Swiss-Prot record:
Transmembrane segments: none
Matches recorded under HAMAP family: His_tRNA_synth, HisZ
One function term, GO molecular function aspect: histidine-tRNA ligase activity
PANTHER family with a match to the protein in the record: HISTIDINE--TRNA LIGASE, MITOCHONDRIAL-RELATED, HISTIDYL-TRNA SYNTHETASE
Protein name, per record: Histidine--tRNA ligase
Gene3D superfamilies membership: Anticodon-binding domain, Bira Bifunctional Protein, Domain 2
InterPro entries to which the protein is assigned, alphabetical: aa-tRNA-synth_II, aa-tRNA-synth_II/BPL/LPL, Anticodon-bd, Anticodon-bd_dom_sf, His-tRNA-ligase, HisRS-like_core, HisRS/HisZ, HisRS_anticodon
Keywords, comma-separated and alphabetical: Aminoacyl-tRNA synthetase, ATP-binding, Cytoplasm, Ligase, Nucleotide-binding, Protein biosynthesis
Main location as per UniProt: cytoplasm
Pfam families: HGTP_anticodon, tRNA-synt_His
Length: 436
């Protein structure tokens, strides 16, 4: 028998959920565009090789990959950064810099569904291409922070780490597989301490190396507390230069007015192999089992890997499936109104009655009132019962006798009161009552 149920890890989004999403998308879009980012949308699927080049081992394992009818290896996009980088390489290498793009789109990963994690999920994000300066990092992290503030979230932190410092740390430990170590550190929050220590030993670290890693991931907190510790730990010129850059980044974020939410966490790696220096993620305390609600970082080598000229870039993605449950849990989403403000009921089967009902409905709609009309031909009592179940505040009754007198009836569904109004002034009167 054919399977006609919903595929595991996906969801049917009903009107109330869609209304919440639309509200969140609108708030985020306003902030993105306020920073002069412009919207783009790439294909839902790309050649699989695009994602295999630098997305990271974990993401590659989770690809929805298949061959099309032409035998080409295709994958649904697991993230947008690779696709946007490909778009840039294909068409915009000679465009004026920086390029500031944003997207709101669905992604696909074959992973185990859990709280805030699905196999089809939505992200809102930006990519800033063409600047290697700390000002670009500050612009992107400030936008990241203000996007959460725009939807009413205030109890969260933006934790900033640095892949250059992690690379340096791997060298200090004598680890050749620095990417492997970063992947392991990135998974630390998904393991108990004992499991993490065991994984470090399996990776080949001795007791001293394990202790150093455990010490590193505890170096986190306010920038003025953490960065001096980093200066003591790292001694190479490259590391010192990067710490100096972090000091400047924090200073610029203060000018943006978002330093209240900023923390430094040297144990952040992020899961994608294409990050090259600054990385960051947002965490909002909750009882829902949801961890990071978004993140990003600088990826200065990815465009070159895709065949383009060396071009610095940075960006982030906000996880919508993680953000919305937290907003609901905190009571930050607005009350969703799905009912119409006015329901128009033509009584009987007379054509002029139907036409008048349509004209009134359309007049209200043109005035931006949410208006609906009875379409099933049911009896008046059943139509009124239906309007009552919807919670409609006002009903317009259009009957043949009233119409012959140039009238229609307006019914207040809460009080049950009815009054006769001029047909020609019906829309105007209803608008006055609604305060439109």
């Amino acid at each position: 028998m054919a399977r006609l149920d919903k595929v595991k890890g996906t969801r049917d989004l009903l009107p109330e959920e869609m209304a919440k999403r639309r509200w969140v998308f609108e708030r985020i879009r306003e902030v993105f565009e306020g920073f002069n980012f412009q919207e783009v949308l790439t294909p839902t699927f790309e050649y699989t090789e695009l994602f295999k080049l630098r997305s990271g081992e974990e993401v590659v394992k989770q690809l929805y990959a298949f061959q099309d009818k032409g035998g080409r290896d295709i994958s649904l996009r697991p993230d947008m950064t690779s696709s946007v980088a490909r778009l840039y390489v294909n068409r915009f290498q000679n465009a004026p810099k920086p390029i500031k793009w944003y997207y709101i789109a669905n992604m696909f990963r074959y992973e185990e569904p859990q709280s805030g994690r699905y196999r089809e999920f939505w992200q809102a994000g930006v990519e800033l291409i063409g600047s290697d300066r700390v000002e670009a990092d500050a612009e992107v992290i400030a936008l990241f922070t203000q996007s959460y503030l725009a939807v009413g979230l205030e109890d969260f932190t933006v934790n900033i780490g640095d892949r250059i410092l992690l690379d340096e740390f791997a060298k200090m430990l004598g680890v050749e597989d620095d990417i492997g170590l970063m992947r392991l550190i990135d998974k630390k929050d998904k393991m108990s301490r004992e499991e993490f220590v065991g994984a470090l030993r399996e990776f080949g670290l001795n007791d001293d190396g394990v202790e150093k890693v455990l010490s590193l991931i505890e170096i986190k907190g306010l920038p003025d507390e953490v960065l001096p510790k980093a200066e003591e730990l790292f001694t190479s010129e490259e590391a010192k230069a990067e710490i100096k850059r972090l000091y400047e980044l924090v200073d610029l974020l203060d000018a943006y007015g978002v330093s209240k939410w900023v923390r430094i966490d040297l144990g952040i790696a992020r899961g994608f192999d294409y990050y090259t220096s600054v990385v960051f993620e947002a965490i909002a305390p909750n009882d829902l089992g949801i961890g990071s609600i978004g993140g990003g970082g600088r990826y200065d080598n990815l465009i070159e890997v895709f065949g383009g000229k060396p071009t610095p870039a940075t960006g982030f993605a906000i996880g919508i499936e993680r953000l919305i449950p937290i907003l609901e849990w905190k009571g930050l989403l607005p009350e969703i109104k799905l009912r119409p403000d006015v329901y128009v009921i033509p009584i009987g089967d007379d054509r002029e009655v139907k036409k008048t009902a349509i004209e009134i409905t359309q007049g209200l709609r043109e005035a931006t009132v949410r208006a609906d009309i009875e379409l099933t031909g049911r009896k008046l009592r059943k139509a009124l019962d239906y309007a009552g179940k919807l919670g409609v505040p006002y009903v317009v009754l259009v009957g043949k006798k009233d119409l012959e007198a140039g009238k229609v009836t307006l019914r207040d569904m809460k009080s049950g009161e009815q009054k006769s109004i001029e047909k020609e002034r019906a829309v105007e009167e209803i608008l006055n009552i609604l305060g439109v």
